[in-house]
Amino acid sequence: MTTKPTIAISHLGCEKNRIDSEHMIGLLVNAGYEVDANEELADYVIVNTCSFIEDARAESVRTLVELAEANKKIVISGCMAQHFQEQLLEELPEAVALVGTGDYHKIVDVIQRTEQGEIVKEVSQEITYIADETVPRYRTTNEAVAYLRVAEGCDYRCAFCIIPHLRGDQRSRPIESIVAEAKQLAEQGVQEIILISQITTNYGKDIYGKPKLAELLRALGGVDVPWIRIHYAYPTGLTPEVIAAMRDTPNVIPYLDLPLQHSHPDILRAMNRPWQGRVNDRIIEDLKKALPDAILRTTFIVGFPGETEEHFQHLVDFVKRHEFDHVGVFTFSAEEGTPAIDLPNQLPQSVKDSRRDALMEIQQPIAARRNELCVGQTVDVLIEQENPATGELIGRSPRFAPDVDGLVYVTGEASLGSIVPVQITAADIYDLYGTIVEA
């Protein structure tokens, strides 16, 4: 009997990529392959790459080169495989296969073909696949947290974004499928489910004829998971129905990740954002009135072609005025295959960097003030880590999403994966500190 090769998976990029990796692991394990976390011990390494911006591509390339130098058989999957295809096979002879973003479910067949000596290119030009609750999945997050993909792809064509080219048009899963997977996750002991897609507020539009996020949230209210968090909510999609569903569904956290990208109408129009110039004060003010306890995270792009000092100052004033809880700032990255790469008035990197640094400097005291409002409160904290040297516990309250926001450093005793009441005693720019409240 032939021994099956050992396989490792190197995951790079976003949560959507993570879910693809988790499905590949699940499928391979089901097929009898040993999946090892140690790349040095593996015969094959699947590198699930990111190609969203230049920095992400550089990280993917570094990983591929290091593995090639270690003489590993490399399977390149994900966004770079979709983006560059034959170019990767030509430049990296150690690559034995390419697997596109709509083809990860074929990973077992791909490995079997490479074992026979074939160089495999499994990259669909029309990307239509989305995994459901029946596809094996091995989660790589900590046991208490899981990402749940409600849709894949995007129907918008923002000038700076290559995602529709890499992941296809939007395709949503039926509500019943999502609820079924949420119940599976609850049975596994998951305490927090994070709903993701490219534009979560557009969920269902492609299969139901109109967005159905409100109905999905209400359906998920019946699942025994304490926290459900929404990522990537477009402000114009936060309809009264969605806001009412958030208010009425106790396990839906009032946390909103709003990818606003800019405030000035000129720049929003140049970006071809779906709301064009309609991100204004009223939208944010109405949202805060409707959800007064909402935790608001947003991201901005500075240095977009044609952004003047006046445009940038408009954004600075917008950030000062609305005091978001969490802000991420990215410099514009000109991506091949997007309209923005050909726009006039491209800005030097030095200007982009200085604007990013200036905006973050303005946001930091705002973030500190928002965190300081928690001092004296008792908040629920999901315990995720323990510092073995000090015994200090580390977790997150509802105001912090994994990886992108802060942490809560906790004194006291609690089991990993449990949610406990913590009295907040101190705060800084990013994190909170507190003590477990004994019952």
UniProtKB/Swiss-Prot annotation:
Organism of this sequence: Picosynechococcus sp. (strain ATCC 27264 / PCC 7002 / PR-6)
InterPro entries per UniProt: Elp3/MiaA/NifB-like_rSAM, Methylthiotransferase, Methylthiotransferase_CS, Methylthiotransferase_N, Methylthiotransferase_N_sf, NA-bd_OB-fold, Ribosomal_uS12_MeSTrfase_RimO, rSAM
Protein name: Ribosomal protein uS12 methylthiotransferase RimO
Residues in TRAM domain copies: 372-438
Any one GO biological process: tRNA modification
Superkingdom, natural source: Bacteria
Cofactors required: [4Fe-4S] cluster
A molecular function GO annotation: protein methylthiotransferase activity
Residues reported to bind [4Fe-4S] cluster 1: 14, 50, 79
Family statement drawn from the similarity comment of this UniProt entry: Belongs to the methylthiotransferase family. RimO subfamily.
Broad class of the protein's primary localization: cytoplasm
Domain Radical SAM core, first and last residues per copy: 140-369
MTTase N-terminal domain segment(s): 5-116
